[in-house]
Amino acid sequence: MNVLIIGVGLIGGSFALALRDRGLAERIEGVEASEEHARRALERGLVDRIVTLEEGLPSADLIVLATPVDTIPLLTVKILNRIAPHQVVMDTGSIKGELCEVVAMHARRGRFVATHPMWGTEYSGPDAASRGAFAGRTAVICERERSDRDAVETVERLYGALGMPLVSMEPEEHDLHTAYVSHISHITSFALALTVLEKEREEQHIFDLAGGGFESTVRPVSYTHLTL
């Protein structure tokens, strides 16, 4: 199987490592907007080569979207516009409601499988990618009945080979539960950072004086797009 990973960062890079370690892909190519991330992805051997979307799409059996969650809906539509009938598209984003609405009426909706592997850290980029990240973690599939059977089976086999239990949910149910178990911690971090910065205008001084506990607590503020 030839795999194209769009966004070779924490999730995309870890996914690539998992595919390699289990011999699930003959070739892994990556699409990466950041030149530095592209360089590191190649240096770490996460992908065989970095390509443009136009270069990578035709030969890919599976296309994995692992870009920031706010970019996934329109990117999914763009990819569905270009794929062949045999290709499978899946995403790894943590918000499903908007995405499933955007692709609902697309002529190739059946080739898309909306998924969310329930794993992540506060770090990002290809250097944050780690081996064994997904084993034992739950993978959620949303609107499986809207996807073609062979597309769902491809994704289920893949997640199964990575040692991930599968759960089916509707998008709204997924987003509600994810908000409780994941996004609330990001909101709390954001509120803490705003409170401290309201009192301390010199942001760098805060991190110079504060210990590692404070820094690790407010680091998820980079995820504020999840709450907007």
Q: Could you tell me what each predicted segment is?
A:
Residues 67, 93, 143:
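Glycine-rich, N-terminal phosphate-binding loop of Rossmann-like dinucleotide-binding domains
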Residues 55-83, 87:
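Rossmann-like NAD(P)-binding element
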Residues 1-53:
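NAD(P)+-binding Rossmann beta1-loop-alpha1 motif at the extreme N-terminus of oxidoreductases
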Residues 133-220:
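Internal alpha-helical scaffold of NAD(P)-dependent oxidoreductase catalytic cores
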Residues 113-141, 146-147:
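Active-site capping/gating segments
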